[in-house]
Regions:
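Flexible glycine/proline-rich, aromatic-decorated loop/lid segments
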Residues: 110-121
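Extended, leucine-rich alpha-helical cores of fungal transcription factors
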Residues: 1-111, 125-142
Length: 142
């Protein structure tokens, strides 16, 4: 991978986030911010990763990632899969960081109704909508 595509320091990563703050919220900018958060976590800058996590989580809420995307007809099957995977990735990293740092959770399970990615195989799109949207709580397997 070319060196210019990789952050060399935590400072470089934080500067990358400043550019994202000027852009409108979209899935691509959220993915970019989340990748910065992952980078900071990987180099054990957990406090900085947690602070960026506040921005990532709030942006995910603004984009409605905590809601089941199958209930909206405007999303393609690929959009639904990306939204689910991105949300649950954010959720898992947020849980890890709050546990590691001993800070309160910013994503409450009661506020989530998006299904796990790949947790269910639905016959049709209408069944997908019914099974996710009709469930007011977090879908649990096992």
């Amino acid at each position: 991978m070319p060196a210019e595509l990789v952050f060399q320091t935590a400072h470089d990563a934080m500067n990358g986030l400043r550019d994202l703050l000027d852009e409108s919220s979209c899935i691509a900018s959220l993915q970019a911010a989340f990748s910065i958060q992952l980078f900071l976590t990987s180099i054990l800058h957990l406090n900085a990763a947690s602070r960026i996590g506040g921005f990532v989580t709030r942006t995910a809420f603004h984009l409605g990632l905590h809601r089941c995307p199958a209930r909206y007809s405007c999303f393609t099957r690929d959009d639904v899969a990306i939204r689910r995977r991105l949300f649950w990735s954010i959720y898992c990293l947020e849980r890890y960081l709050t546990q590691a740092l001993g800070v309160p959770l910013s994503i409450r399970d009661d506020d989530i109704d998006v299904c796990y990615p790949g947790a269910e195989r639905h016959q049709t799109d209408s069944e997908d909508v019914m099974s996710c949207a009709g469930n007011g709580s977090l879908y649990r397997t096992g």
